[in-house]
Structure formats: structure tokens, C-alpha cells
Design a protein with these regions (language model features):
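Mature catalytic domains of secreted/periplasmic carbohydrate-active enzymes
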Residues: 1-206
């Protein structure tokens, strides 16, 4: 949720006042574009993750987040959809505020009306506080493949996707030893379990 952009995003650097995308600093490459091109060459339909929250943005740190939503979030989402035409749009970091604050209804409507691939693109259910399992094209559960929380009931009526890391974290965690990571056997067994119940597995390798 640090907001660093792996594609040429002028607004990210403009708002912060220093380079904050992969074209202006670091590799000076459109890493996202290169990944999408490589995926499509192999017949893989790529998706996009986008974090609503942005921990260190000077605009997100304000109590009134409307300027952040209008100046950063919405323009970036539209840019990503138009530029890369993802098959999946996967927002996250929505849980602290309602969908009206994020302007999610307007964003979803815009995506379905303006995406170059309207017959292909799907969106998940992470659009506002308390809405998981109720909106979007499918439900996302998290570290819940055994069905022992509220996600259990939703899976019976909606397509679902279980997302989790190979360890207990979605990113590098110095506190995790190798014994925390799932074995190959455990990963395969989890995948079989999910698919047998009509779900899919989104495995993060952080």
C-alpha cells in the first residue's frame, strides 16, 4: 500500500513532489507494460491489483480524503484500464471507508461502460467497507480456504477466489522463517480443495 507505481504515472510523482513511478526512478521502465506484453505473448490474460489506501501519500494522510480520490485514485484507475486493458481489476485496501467515500459506484460504472474489453473484464468485491461478498463479479476470501468464517456461506451462491500468501504475510517478512511457508504438497492440496468446491486460488509469493 505504498502507492509506488510500476507504470508511468505522472500524478503519483506530481502529488508527492518527487519521482514515484518506475519510469522516473529506479529501472526507468514501464514494468507493468512489459509484464502484460509477456503474459499475452504466452496466452495468459493478466489482471491488475490496485490499492485504494496509500500509506504515505500527502493527500491520503488528510482527514478529508476526497482530494486524494479525485486527483490520484480515480485518474490512476482510469489510466490503468485504458492503457493495459486488464482481464481482472482487483482493488484492495477499501475496508476503512464506505464505497461512497471511494466513489466506487461511479468507478465500477465507468469501467463497465468504457473498458475496451467489456466482455472480458471482471472486478472483485473490494469496493467499500463491509461490502465483500455482496458486490462485484465474484467474492474474495483471504486465508480462509477451509471455510471457517463468513466466507463459507457466500461461496455457495457466488463464484469465489481464495487469496493468500505462501506464508503468513503478503510481502517480505523478516519474522517468518522457512518453516512458516507452505510446502509444495500443501499448496497443491489447497488448490485441489478449492477447485473441488468451485473456487480458484490466488497465491501470492511476495
Amino acid at each position: 500500500h505504498d502507492g509506488f507505481c510500476l507504470w508511468p504515472s505522472e500524478v503519483a510523482s506530481e502529488v508527492r513532489g518527487y519521482p514515484w513511478d518506475s519510469m522516473r526512478t529506479g529501472p526507468k521502465r514501464d514494468l507493468l507494460g512489459e509484464l502484460f506484453e509477456a503474459c499475452r505473448e504466452e496466452g495468459v490474460r493478466p489482471g491488475l491489483y490496485y490499492s485504494f489506501m496509500e500509506w504515505e501519500s500527502p493527500l491520503y494522510s488528510k482527514s478529508d480524503k476526497s482530494e486524494y480520490v479525485d486527483r490520484v485514485m480515480i485518474p490512476q484507475i482510469k489510466d490503468l484500464i485504458e492503457r493495459y486493458q486488464p482481464a481482472v481489476f482487483w482493488p484492495d485496501g477499501e475496508w476503512d471507508f464506505p464505497d461512497t467515500m471511494w466513489k466506487s459506484p461511479e468507478i465500477v460504472e465507468w469501467i463497465y461502460e468504457n473498458a475496451a474489453n467489456p466482455e472480458e473484464i471482471v472486478v472483485n468485491d473490494r469496493w467499500g467497507q463491509g461490502l465483500r461478498g455482496q458486490v462485484g463479479d465474484y467474492t474474495t476470501t483471504e486465508y480462509d480456504n477451509l471455510g471457517n468464517s463468513s466466507g463459507k456461506g457466500m461461496r455457495k451462491t457466488r463464484p469465489f477466489e481464495e487469496c493468500r500468501g505462501v506464508g503468513h504475510s503478503f510481502a517480505f517478512n523478516r519474522a517468518e522463517g522457512y518453516d512458516i511457508y507452505d510446502s509444495r504438497t500443501a499448496c497443491v492440496q489447497r488448490l485441489i480443495d478449492l477447485v473441488s468446491r468451485g473456487g480458484v486460488l490466488l497465491l501470492d509469493i511476495g
